[in-house]
Regions:
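Short linear sequence motif anchored by a di-proline
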Residues: 1-201
Length: 201
């Protein structure tokens, strides 16, 4: 996916810059460095905070930041149970992942053709995510990281056409996945609401 320009993030989400320079990748791939917005950790009241971290959540039990399995996406229906995500989910460590666009693979021609998704109104995407802070016990280095949440899209008229079909699964049970856009009016609830409130978005 493509992160927005820094000034667009500041304007869209009313969050100030902690650093005068852009410090994330121009185009994001798993394990790259990208921006995310969370509830400010050091503020007594509610504020938004812009952070850069690895796209691929580093769980508390990791031995090193580079994992042997992917954590760039997390199934929303499994957050409360999966070891990698259940603690950030229970603690309310939700974030917004800003995106100008994102790409999904379409296999209707028999080969992968990337489709790019942008909002028709020209606005930026606010994608649902979880974040975690992990400290390397050997070096003391602090790593910020995040994962992008997904939802089943088998009944969505467009998103069900994305991703390679599973030949072993019936046509109506492919478990096609989609990212989860959060509307502007729901951003604060997603960042600071209860788990129950966030689950309804």
């Amino acid at each position: 996916y493509t992160p927005p320009a820094l000034q667009d993030i500041e304007r869209e989400w009313a969050v100030g810059r902690p650093n005068p320079l852009r410090w994330w990748d121009e185009v994001l791939f798993p394990r790259g460095t990208g921006p995310f917005i969370r509830r400010a950790r050091e503020s007594a009241s509610y504020e938004r905070e812009l952070v850069a971290g690895q796209w691929g959540l580093i769980p508390w039990f990791a031995k090193e930041p580079k994992l042997k399995y992917p954590t760039n996406n997390a199934r929303s229906e499994e957050l409360a149970d999966k070891a990698s995500y259940k603690h950030p989910w229970a603690r309310g460590q939700r974030c917004i992942i800003p995106a100008s666009d994102f790409d999904e693979p379409n296999w209707e021609t028999g080969r992968n053709v990337w489709w790019r998704f942008k909002r028709v109104d020209g606005a930026l995407w606010s994608l649902a995510g979880l974040w975690n802070t992990w400290t390397d016990k050997a070096t003391g280095e602090v790593h910020e990281s995040y994962t992008m949440l997904t939802i089943n899209a088998d009944t969505h008229p467009l998103m069900k056409r994305m991703h390679k079909p599973d030949p072993k699964a019936p046509a109506d049970a492919q478990d096609k996945r989609s990212v989860i856009p959060i509307e502007a009016g729901d951003v604060d609830t997603w960042l600071a609401g209860t788990v129950e409130e966030a689950s309804t978005l």
